[in-house]
UniProtKB/Swiss-Prot annotation:
Keywords: Cell inner membrane, Cell membrane, Lipid-binding, Membrane, Transmembrane, Transmembrane helix, Transport. It comes from the Bacteria. It is found in: Membrane; Cell inner membrane. GO terms for cellular component: membrane; plasma membrane. Disruption phenotype: No effect on chemoheterotrophic growth, and no defects in the production of photosynthetic pigments. When oxygen levels are reduced during chemoheterotrophic growth, mutant cells respond more rapidly than wild-type and display faster accumulation of carotenoids and bacteriochlorophylls. One of its GO terms (biological process) is tetrapyrrole metabolic process. NCBIfam families: T-richsensTspOAlph (NF047825). It holds the Pfam family TspO_MBR. May play a role in the transmembrane transport of tetrapyrroles and similar compounds, and thereby contribute to the regulation of tetrapyrrole biosynthesis. Binds tetrapyrroles and promotes the photooxidative degradation of protoporphyrin IX. Binds protoporphyrin IX, hemin, and coproporphyrin III, but does not bind delta-aminolevulinic acid. Can bind bilirubin, curcumin, gossypol, retinoic acid, cholesterol and the benzodiazepine receptor agonist PK-11195 (in vitro). Plays a role in the response to low oxygen levels and in the regulation of the biosynthesis of photosynthetic pigments. This is Tryptophan-rich sensory protein. The gene is tspO. Homodimer. The chain crosses the membrane at residues 5-25, 44-65, 73-93, 97-119, 124-144.
């Protein structure tokens, strides 16, 4: 399969939506004061992980977009990207942990559906999506644990 740079860069640009919300709504004093699980990664891990994931996601989507019958897979891709974009404003902006948990759980379902659909069309595209599903699983767990460990705070139940 050929590397279609225009297509790759288009998908990478689409990752700019969640990247922008992440850059604009960074963890703040509120987040610093939350009780978090012992396995919560240090802050510097997040931009490195997301940069790597956006690259892999874009490469996978580029491969799939070149194939016949990729419409459903790309619809799943767009949906997971939309929920990815939504999570940061809900969690960090609105400080609504329970609502953010619902958002990240739906995102996880679309990430899993995207990975499955990609595997059906192109094995390498599916493989490229595996790290994202692992990261989304960890993110869901972190959101749940932040909510659970801070249940006495009103924003945990919102």
């Amino acid at each position: 399969m050929n590397m279609d740079w225009a297509l790759f860069l288009t998908f990478l640009a689409a990752c700019g939506a969640p990247a922008t919300t992440g850059a604009l709504l960074k963890p703040d004093e509120w987040y610093d004061n939350l009780n978090k699980p012992w396995w919560n990664p240090p802050r510097w891990v997040f931009p490195l992980a997301w940069t790597s994931l956006y690259f892999l996601m874009s490469l996978a989507a580029m491969r799939v977009a070149q194939l016949e019958g990729s419409g459903q897979a790309l619809a799943f891709y767009a949906a997971q990207l939309a929920f990815n974009t939504l999570w940061t404003p809900v969690f960090f902006g609105m400080k609504r942990m329970a609502t953010a948990l619902a958002v990240v759980m739906v995102m996880w379902l679309f990430v899993a559906a995207t990975m499955w659909a990609f595997f059906q069309l192109d094995t390498w595209a599916g493989v490229l999506f595996v790290p994202y599903l692992i990261w989304a699983t960890a993110a869901t767990g972190l959101n749940f644990e932040a909510m659970r460990l801070n249940w006495n705070r009103p924003e945990a139940r919102a």
